[in-house]
UniProtKB/Swiss-Prot annotation:
The lineage of its organism: Bacteria, Bacillati, Bacillota, Bacilli, Bacillales. InterPro entries: Anticodon_Met, Met-tRNA-synth_bsu_C, Met-tRNA_synth, Met-tRNA_synth_2, Methionyl/Leucyl_tRNA_Synth, MetRS_core, NA-bd_OB-fold, Rossmann-like_a/b/a_fold. Residues 564-665 form the tRNA-binding domain. Belongs to the class-I aminoacyl-tRNA synthetase family. MetG type 2B subfamily. This is Methionine--tRNA ligase. GO terms for molecular function: ATP binding; methionine-tRNA ligase activity; tRNA binding. ATP binds at residue 314. A motif ('KMSKS' region) lies at residues 311-315. GO terms for biological process: methionyl-tRNA aminoacylation.
Length: 665
């Protein structure tokens, strides 16, 4: 759980490497950090939110040379692109650090000198396999693929990333990592929330610390675009000290004006992609230990946004341009999708279908319709004025208030644990419950009976009040929609928009005037048209195919032997019952008859493609010997096979002539 003991809050993203245009992956990390920064500000914290760019290195030097411009001109151009995207995303960062800035360079030089003087850095020689793309050395055993000559000598290979490596031998300064290994493990054990999710910590210990930490090369001589090592200018400070130290140099560490450093350090949470967790939870804390500085309270390693065919790549034609999504669908649609669709900490899949569905079902239908109906009814029944709050009048009022109180409590717990998708799911349950309240109270019926006027007024005040609270809870995630809700409800007092106001009820002054005619905050999209549009835009950067693509993509999966296939037990099953899974938009819970004398429960992510009643009685094919797994608190004992086309799943049906439990061969 994030710390609550002080009124400052320091949060960082990684500094991004400007070797290309900012994309949706960068947007994901930075929007997540922005949501947490906005949440903490709402709760009264003095927040410092840092992001920036890592602008030194061999790859930058090579890119600038290709363009025929200086390194500084190159990074200035790319850094400006990142800052433009943050502005477009309305990121509320406090500062933007660039490693080419003098404030950073001066502090890095002092850090290097201190570590050298106290013996944590020494001069030696390094020989190893180096990847220019990764800007990292690898031992032979770490290589994903090794190339050998006819004599069996290793002459090259590929890094774990798939990038080519070359043998490099050079003089280098080294950091004594092993000196601090035991102390680091002790810190892990005494601070269980230092690395989250938990799986990341286990990976660091088992894969990197237990095998033994090797001393780390922290300077380079094969390129010169970087900060010169004090007293030995043929060396430049390597990324581990140069880039990682930005989190303290941005605060004025080791300068005459270190007020911000004294105020905000240590960081409360540092958000990083899972591919750089090692650098931030091994190299970075060891460096801080050597400098005798406190460690960050938490490093949170989030997953990747993937496409159906893997990571984004221009060659695959699956690159998602955040500018395109913002310009066509609005900023809040993108911010909502990024933080609702993917559980923070796990990998997630971007599909045009899911994006359009989120806009239509969640934003336009659930939230938009609730606001439209409420404003319309207040205009129709009370001449546009919100009635005075009179407590709980109808039999449904107290239930609605209790539900709100519970959601607020759950929401805060989820946000404090960086579980953004869970918090949004809880918030949407309040939106759904408020929509249900309209159906329960039937204000159109109450309006026909003058004796029910008090009840009708109570319904209107409860609807307006819930919408006000929903708008407050939306503020960490969406930058424009909350203001539009406040505007349509006629809420001008700032106190009604503050965090503390959500704990009470009936805060809206009687007689507050709503707008005469509300406008849809999220117009409904033509699903098929918009899915096609996004798909075409994603393909726009792909090179022209060598020949017309086949109707079905060629499989690129590795071949297996019959002995591997025989391990899979496929059985025919009859669908006896299907239910929707609460708080899980995509899951259906099946009760299947596999001829075992009892029904077997299997969960499948096909809820968006079928209504439960469509599936009852069908014969399906099930992987029956799959290891049971718990999903959303429900046990799933198998997998139902489906086929996929154009993003839509279709259950593979078996012949009705086959008995339940028949083996599929």
């Amino acid at each position: 759980m994030l710390p609550e003991e002080k009124n400052t809050f320091y949060i960082t993203t990684p500094i991004y490497y400007p070797s290309g245009k900012a994309h949706i992956g960068h947007a994901y990390t930075t929007v997540a950090g922005d949501a947490m920064a906005r949440y903490k500000r709402l709760k009264g914290y003095d927040v410092f939110y840092l992001t920036g760019t890592d602008e030194h290195g061999q790859k930058i030097q090579a890119k600038a040379k290709e363009r025929g411009i200086s390194e500084q001109e190159y990074v200035d151009e790319i850094a400006e692109g990142f800052q433009e995207l943050w502005k477009k995303l309305e990121i509320s960062n406090t500062d933007f650090i660039r490693t080419t800035q003098d404030r950073h360079k001066t502090s890095v030089e002092k850090i290097f000198e201190q570590l050298l003087e106290q013996g944590d850095i020494y001069l030696g020689e390094y020989e190893g396999w180096y990847s220019v793309s990764d800007e990292e050395y690898f031992t032979e055993t770490q290589l994903e693929e090794v190339y050998k000559d006819e004599n069996g000598k290793v002459i090259g290979g590929k890094a774990p990333s798939g990038n080519e490596v070359e043998l490099v031998k050079e003089e280098s300064y080294f950091f004594r990592m092993s000196k601090y290994a035991d102390r680091l493990v002790e810190y892990y054990n005494s601070h269980p929330e230092f690395i989250l999710p938990e799986s990341r910590k286990n990976e660091m210990i088992n894969n990197f610390i237990k095998p033994g930490l090797e001393d780390l090369a922290v300077s380079r001589t094969t390129f010169d675009w970087g900060i010169k090592v004090p007293g030995n200018p043929k060396h430049v400070v390597y990324v581990w000290i140069d880039a990682l130290s930005n989190y303290i140099t941005a605060l004025g560490y080791n300068t005459d004006n270190d007020t911000k450093f004294q105020k905000y350090w240590p960081a409360d949470v540092q958000i990083v992609g899972k591919e750089i967790v090692r650098f931030h939870t091994i190299y970075w804390p060891i460096m801080l230990m050597a400098l005798d500085l406190p460690l960050p309270k938490m490093v949170f390693g989030h997953g990747w946004i993937l496409m159906k065919d893997g990571k984004m790549s221009k060659s695959k034609g699956n690159v998602v341009d955040p500018y395109m999504l913002i310009d066509r669908y609005g900023l809040d649609a993108l911010r909502y999708y990024l933080l609702r669709e993917v559980p923070f900490g796990s990998d997630g899949l971007f599909t045009p279908e899911d994006f359009v569905d989120r806009v239509n079902f969640d934003l336009a239908n659930d939230l938009g319709n609730l606001l439209n109906r409420t404003v319309a009814m207040i205009n129709k029944y009370f001449d546009g004025e919100i009635p005075a709050y009179q407590g709980n009048v109808t039999e449904f009022d107290q239930t609605l208030v209790d539900f709100k109180n519970n959601v607020v409590k759950e929401y805060e717990g989820s946000m404090d644990h960086m579980q953004f998708s869970v918090a949004l799911n809880q918030l949407w349950s309040l939106i759904s419950r408020t929509n249900k309240y309209i159906d329960e109270t039937a204000p159109w019926t109450l309006a026909k009976d003058e004796d029910k006027r008090t009840e009708l007024a109570s319904v209107m005040t409860h609807l307006a009040e819930n919408l006000r609270i929903i708008a407050v809870l939306l503020q960490p995630f969406l930058t424009r929609t909350p203001g539009e809700i406040f505007l349509q409800l006629g809420l001008q007092e700032e106190n009604l928009k503050k965090w503390d106001s959500i704990y009470g009820y009936g805060e809206i002054p009687a007689g507050t005037t709503v707008v005469k005619k509300g406008t849809p905050i999220f117009p409904r999209l033509e699903a098929e048209v918009e899915v096609t549009y996004i798909q075409d835009e994603m393909k726009g950067s792909a090179p022209a195919p060598a020949k017309e693509a086949a109707e079905v993509e060629a499989l690129e999966t590795p071949q297996i032997g019959i002995e591997d296939f025989d391990k899979i037990d496929l059985r025919v099953a009859e669908v006896k019952q299907v239910d929707k899974v609460k708080k899980a938009d995509k899951l259906l819970c099946f009760q299947l008859d596999l001829g075992e004398g009892k029904l077997r429960q299997v969960l499948s992510g096909i809820a968006e493609f079928y209504q439960p009643e469509e599936l009852i009685g069908k014969k399906v094919i099930v992987v029956s010997n799959l290891k049971p797994v718990k999903l959303r608190g429900l046990m799933s004992e198998g997998m139902i096979l489906s086929g996929e086309k154009d993003g839509k799943l279709s259950v593979i049906e078996a012949s009705s002539a086959l008995p339940n439990g028949a083996k599929v061969k």
